[in-house]
UniProtKB/Swiss-Prot annotation:
Belongs to the G-protein coupled receptor 1 family. The keyword Membrane applies. It holds the Pfam family 7tm_4. It comes from Homo sapiens (Human). InterPro entries: GPCR_Rhodpsn, GPCR_Rhodpsn_7TM, Olfact_rcpt, Olfactory_Receptors. This is Olfactory receptor 4D10. One of its GO terms (cellular component) is plasma membrane. The gene is OR4D10.
Length: 311
């Protein structure tokens, strides 16, 4: 009966990050700078890995895939946020909202599975160095990458399949700056208790479990190379530290958002900005600043693209 008497809303209205015009302009410039830097940083990694034959290894192949995902993840929300910061009325159509949610959870799932594959790569590299090339062959890496994208697709389609049949008759105001399941679900004109539990389980609890499994896996990895000599152990620790930092930046905000009842809290928008905008920016910095191999490859690429004038 609810669906029969329900006229589905045609759009949602965002309250956005702020209602203050001056603050909106400052945020616009800041987020534009962050977005452009994110694109350039991840594109630089992709071009370097593609052009430098020394980086044609499983670890950098997986990093290349993560950079693609980070560009996509940032592009799902940030361009719309930039437009809204300059707009008086911040709206999004019903179909666009659900498309944004689908893509958001698709790429978010890809990020989670890709970080897991990268942990597997480090484990094999450190624990089974003699068999590394066989276990992490190019075909296997491609298969794992495809599996990460399929996993993200399945995760996302489950979210949308649960939300789409619900009656959205109004209200249609979202106190956020992008469409996400925990916000949109609260607008459904029906009892959402069971669905909220399913969403928390599918997003929050699984994300929390996955995070601790990854942390444990890296602790195990770091305990493996004790028998290795200094340089090999230092390189392993440096690489794993970068991975742990990225995993923490990605998972902790997600756990805060999804592993609790879907009630609005004062810190929600700031935390959402952290993992939708800031995390894709920091990933390339983290993976390059402590990676001498990547920095050397970038310098070689620069010399090839910008030849020195010196004779």
């Amino acid at each position: 009966m609810e669906m029969e008497n329900c006229t589905r809303v045609k759009e949602f209205i965002f309250l956005g990050l702020t209602q203050n015009r001056e603050v909106s302009l400052v945020l616009f410039l800041f987020l534009l700078l962050v977005y452009v830097t994110t694109l350039l940083g991840n594109l630089l990694i992709m071009v370097t890995v593609t052009c430098e034959s020394r980086l044609h290894t499983p670890m950098y192949f997986l990093l290349h895939n993560l950079s693609i995902a980070d560009i996509c993840f940032s592009s799902i929300t940030v361009p719309k946020v930039l437009v809204d910061l300059l707009s008086e009325r911040k709206t999004i159509s019903f179909n666009h909202c659900f498309t944004q949610m689908f893509l958001f959870h698709l790429i978010g799932g890809v990020d989670v599975f890709s970080l897991s594959v990268m942990a597997l790569d480090r484990y094999v590299a450190i624990s089974k160095p003699l068999h590394y090339a066989t276990i992490m062959s190019r075909d296997h890496c491609i298969g794992l990458t495809v599996a990460a994208w399929l996993g993200g697709f399945v995760h996302s389609i489950v979210q949308i399949s649960l939300l789409l049949p619900l009656p959205f008759c109004g209200p249609n105001v979202l106190d956020t700056f992008y469409c996400d399941v925990h916000r949109v679900l609260k607008l459904a004109h029906t009892d959402i208790f069971i669905l909220e539990l399913l969403m928390i389980s599918n997003n929050g609890l699984l994300t929390t479990l996955w995070f601790f499994l990854l942390l444990v896996s890296y602790i195990v990895i770091l305990s493996l190379p004790k028998s290795q000599a200094g340089e090999g152990r230092r390189k392993a620790i440096s690489t794993c530290t970068s991975h742990i930092t990225v995993v923490t930046l990605h998972f902790v905000p997600c756990i805060y958002v999804y592993a609790r009842p879907f009630t609005a809290l004062p810190m929600d928008k700031a935390i959402s900005v952290t993992f939708t905008v800031i995390s894709p920016l920091l990933n390339p910095l983290i993976y390059t600043l402590r990676n001498h191999e990547m920095k050397s490859a970038m310098r070689r690429l620069k010399r090839r693209l910008v030849p020195s004038d010196r004779k």
